[in-house]
Design a protein with these regions (language model features):
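Phosphate/diphosphate ligand-binding glycine-rich loop within oxidoreductases
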Residues: 56-124
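N-terminal glycine-/charge-rich "phosphate-binding" loop or analogous flexible N-terminal tail
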Residues: 1-59
Length: 124
């Protein structure tokens, strides 16, 4: 069985990337954050390289998605976004597609609570 191709479109840092890569030999993680930024700046070479990665991608992980991601990633099964909301990704193509779209809703509750309490304690 071939490894599952995961394309990361947002910079997550080398330590976290290494943690994900070493998690299982059944996944192949590619950091495409520089290519994604290049595409946003109009770099045709970066777009071509990103297209090549997206053509094989089964999973995309990131804060933002490449334009026309569903058309560019025909093997795509799952998109994991790094934000709590996914409303900005829900166009008719995404809604009608078999791709699973998930978010990180709820994971920030404790850190935000601790931060707010810390700010309140500054005034005591």
């Amino acid at each position: 069985m071939a490894a599952i191709s995961v394309v990361v479109t947002s910079g997550i840092g080398p330590e976290l990337l290494h943690q994900i890569i070493s998690g299982s030999p059944k996944i192949k993680v590619t950091d495409a954050s520089n290519l994604f930024r290049g595409e946003l700046k109009g770099d045709a070479a970066a777009k071509a390289k990103l297209d090549s990665l997206l053509a094989r991608a089964e999973v995309i992980y990131g804060l933002r998605l490449p334009q026309n991601v569903l058309a560019r990633a025909p093997r795509l099964k799952w998109i994991q976004v790094m934000s709590a909301g996914v409303d900005r990704f829900l166009d008719i193509d995404m809604i009608d597609s078999p791709v699973t779209l998930t978010n990180v809703s709820g994971i920030h509750a404790i850190p935000i609570s601790e931060f707010v309490i810390g700010l309140m304690l500054m005034f005591v």
